[in-house]
């Protein structure tokens, strides 16, 4: 299997026993020893088992290029590419609300760069938000070991600034001011739905 640049896909045994996804091809581990993806998956599993919410990670799309059929009943994929996801990382349902969000990590101490967010992802978030979905970015600053929920309604202002070539990133202070801090705890480690509760309350007031 190959990536879009033509380079072959190789398993990384140092990450999750050799498993690796395209959406987190540059997985960064925070001071607490787990990636944002792992923490989010553990939280989602806890929510599901506790009948709190049903939220899942969307599979990374793969484009199959070459298939060999050594036998009629068996197909062997000789060449395939990971495609750029057309939407966000996670979606689901929580207390009757549609939840849709992108999860990102950065090593930067002072800002979150916007160059790894794609136009079609923002367009998807915009469409979901216009349908009254609860849409946001979950951002972890690895070095600071801090996680924030940034609502789409706030993010779109920074995105417009980025597209207008005014500023290529969102500062930590801007995220702290416009987002919701998600503290670590015991179970689940990252209870981001508490921040979602605050977002739902705030947006219900803003949209009236």
Curated annotation (Swiss-Prot):
Keywords: Cytoplasm, DNA damage, DNA recombination, DNA repair, Endonuclease, Hydrolase, Magnesium, Metal-binding, Nuclease. GO terms for molecular function: endonuclease activity; magnesium ion binding; nucleic acid binding. Its EC number is 3.1.21.10. Its main location: cytoplasm. The record marks 104 as: Transition state stabilizer. Pfam families: RecU. It comes from the Bacteria. Binds 1 Mg(2+) ion per subunit. It is found in: Cytoplasm. Mg(2+) binds at residues 87, 89, 102, 121. InterPro entries: Resolv_RecU (IPR004612), Restrct_endonuc-II-like (IPR011335), tRNA_endonuc-like_dom_sf (IPR011856). It catalyses: Endonucleolytic cleavage at a junction such as a reciprocal single-stranded crossover between two homologous DNA duplexes (Holliday junction). One of its GO terms (cellular component) is cytoplasm. One of its GO terms (biological process) is DNA repair. Its cofactor is Mg(2+). Belongs to the RecU family. Endonuclease that resolves Holliday junction intermediates in genetic recombination. Cleaves mobile four-strand junctions by introducing symmetrical nicks in paired strands. Promotes annealing of linear ssDNA with homologous dsDNA. Required for DNA repair, homologous recombination and chromosome segregation. NCBIfam families: PRK02234.1-2, PRK02234.1-4, PRK02234.1-5, recU. This is Holliday junction resolvase RecU. It comes from Staphylococcus aureus. The gene is recU.
């Amino acid at each position: 299997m190959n990536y879009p640049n033509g380079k072959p896909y190789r398993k990384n045994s140092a990450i999750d026993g050799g498993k690796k996804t395209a959406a987190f091809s540059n997985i960064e581990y925070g001071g607490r020893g787990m990636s944002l993806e792992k923490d989010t998956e553990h939280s989602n599993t806890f929510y599901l088992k506790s009948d709190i919410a049903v939220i899942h990670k969307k599979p990374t799309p793969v484009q199959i290029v070459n298939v060999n059929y050594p036998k009629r009943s068996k197909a062997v994929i000789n060449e395939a590419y990971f495609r750029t996801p057309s939407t966000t990382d996670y979606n689901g349902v929580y207390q009757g609300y549609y939840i849709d969000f992108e999860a990102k990590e950065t090593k930067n101490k002072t800002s979150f760069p916007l160059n790894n967010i794609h136009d079609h992802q923002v367009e998807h978030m915009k469409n979901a938000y216009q349908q009254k979905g609860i849409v946001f970015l979950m951002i972890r600053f690895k070095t600071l070991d801090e996680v924030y929920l940034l609502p789409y309604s706030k993010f779109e202002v920074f995105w417009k600034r980025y597209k207008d070539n005014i500023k290529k990133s969102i500062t930590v202070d801007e995220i702290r001011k416009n987002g919701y801090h998600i503290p670590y705890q015991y179970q689940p480690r990252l209870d981001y739905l508490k921040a979602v509760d605050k977002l739902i309350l705030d947006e219900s007031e803003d949209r009236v």
